[in-house]
Regions:
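Catalytic beta-strand/loop cores that center a nucleophilic Ser/Cys/Thr
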Residues: 82
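Glycine-/acidic-rich phosphate or pyrophosphate-binding loops and their flanking alpha/beta elements
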Residues: 85-102
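Short, flexible loop motifs at catalytic/binding sites
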Residues: 1-78, 97-281
Length: 281
């Protein structure tokens, strides 16, 4: 309002670092005639001599160079766990329209937050391919909300992969979230094995080479995977050996549970712990 009242202007100048809020502003400006947007790549402007650019590429590496000099929002950000793999997914055209195949069951993989976001991936296993057809994320709502979302999507579900701590009973109700989900019709379930986070990350890396993503329905989940990164120690100026917890954690964790918790008969994934809970009242 302060700008509008005075017929003022706002200028946003920045360097890409994945498709974050700066990307959202830039993307919106491209389709709004009241905005002006421009991208000035070093290779286009001719301001810097070629030998200087070549030296920068050798020193910085391809991804950082693409961000800093070529204004790339697609380049892997520093410390990203899946930067290389997601770049390959993009370059090979595996982010596209991926329709639901009614002849194949849908597997969901959940990251259940307590007072935090809950994320769900929807996958179909067709031959060696893992097709991510949908993604959903929300916060501040109960489990009944997610059960309703699954019902409204009208997919035929084969299994629901849940984290191992879903079996812990809550103090307030004396029931586990597993029991609550079962009462809401979320069955059968697969309990993902309890593994080290690094092992799960490696499982996702191995799986991403076979993944296809629906560009529209999985957009936020795709960006979560692209930007999921190591925690950075600002004081020591080093990467810590653990993930940074932010908005990307939810989608990345749900993908990790999918990678370690479900085995398609045609795949080489490890055996899951499966429990059919139809008998729980």
């Amino acid at each position: 309002p302060a700008i509008a009242d005075r017929q003022g202007r706002a200028t946003f100048i920045g360097t890409p670092k994945g498709k974050n809020e700066f990307w959202e502003i830039f993307d919106a400006s491209r389709n709004d005639p009241t905005w002006y947007s421009a991208v000035h790549k070093a290779s286009d402007t001719g301001i810097l001599p070629g030998d200087e650019l070549d030296a920068a590429l050798k020193t910085m590496g391809e991804d950082r160079y693409e961000q800093e000099f070529e204004c790339s929002f697609e380049a892997a950000i520093a410390g990203a766990y899946y930067g290389t793999e997601m770049k390959e997914v993009t370059n090979t055209g595996r982010i596209a329209a991926v329709p639901y195949d009614r002849a194949v069951g849908v597997v969901t993989a959940w990251d259940l937050g307590i007072g935090d976001s809950t994320s769900i991936w929807f996958a179909q296993h067709v031959g060696a391919e893992v097709r991510l057809i949908d993604y959903y994320e929300s916060s501040g709502v109960g489990l009944d909300h997610y059960a309703k979302v699954l019902q409204e999507k009208d997919y035929v579900y084969e299994s629901h992969v849940l984290p191992h701590d879903v079996q812990v009973k809550e103090l307030g109700t004396g029931k586990s979230r597993l029991e609550t989900l079962d009462s809401l019709g979320i069955r059968p379930v697969t309990i993902a094995p309890k593994l080290m986070v690094d092992d799960g990350i490696q499982a996702v890396r191995s799986m991403l080479g076979r993944c296809w993503f629906d560009e529209t329905k999985c957009n936020r989940g795709i960006e979560a995977l692209r930007q999921y990164q190591r925690d950075f120690d600002e004081k020591g100026r080093t990467w810590r050996g653990r993930p940074r917890h932010d908005w990307t954690s939810h989608g990345a964790d749900a993908m990790r549970y999918l990678a370690v918790g479900y085995q398609n008969q045609a795949s080489s994934w490890g055996d899951p712990i499966r429990r059919n809970l139809r008998g729980i009242a």
